[in-house]
Design a protein with these regions (language model features):
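Thioredoxin-like thiol-disulfide oxidoreductase module
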Residues: 39-57, 88
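Conserved helix-turn-beta segment immediately C-terminal to the redox Cys motif
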Residues: 26-37
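Ser/Thr/Gly-rich flexible loops in soluble cytosolic domains mediating phosphotransfer, phosphorylation
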Residues: 76-99
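A short, hydrophobic beta-strand/beta-hairpin element that forms part of a small beta-sheet core
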Residues: 58-70
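Solvent-exposed alpha-helical segments within well-ordered globular domains of core cellular machineries
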Residues: 19-22, 26, 48, 80, ...
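Basic, low-complexity intrinsically disordered segments
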Residues: 73
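Local sequence-structure signature of Cys/Sec-based thiol-disulfide redox active-site neighborhoods
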Residues: 1-28
Length: 99
């Protein structure tokens, strides 16, 4: 089973960031089962991490593993957009068409 390592960069704890976290956790539970590790990083509390990773906007979701590195910036409530950004939707669609 593949292990996905995800980092979500947010700016403060607001209703919008809580919604982004909730949406992302829901997508991960449904589509990645337990094969993921999610870290939430507040760029206001840890600006050096954001600078090192060149995070210019929030929310930004970074898939570190498996390679290649992928980023999804902005609205995380759209499941399909997040899965395409993580490079999962195309693979899932292809697998369904084969069966």
């Amino acid at each position: 089973m593949k292990q996905f390592v995800l980092k979500l960069y947010i700016a403060g704890r607001t209703q919008r960031t809580e919604q982004a976290i909730s949406s992302l956790k829901e997508i991960c539970e449904k589509d990645l089962a337990s094969a993921y590790e999610l870290s939430v990083i507040d760029v206001l509390e840890r600006p050096q991490l954001a600078e090192n990773e060149k995070i210019l906007a929030t929310p930004t979701l970074v898939r570190e593993l498996p390679p290649p590195l992928r980023r999804v910036v902005g609205d995380l409530s759209n499941r399909e957009r997040v899965l395409v950004g993580l490079d999962l939707a195309v693979r899932d669609t292809f697998d369904q068409e084969k069966n």
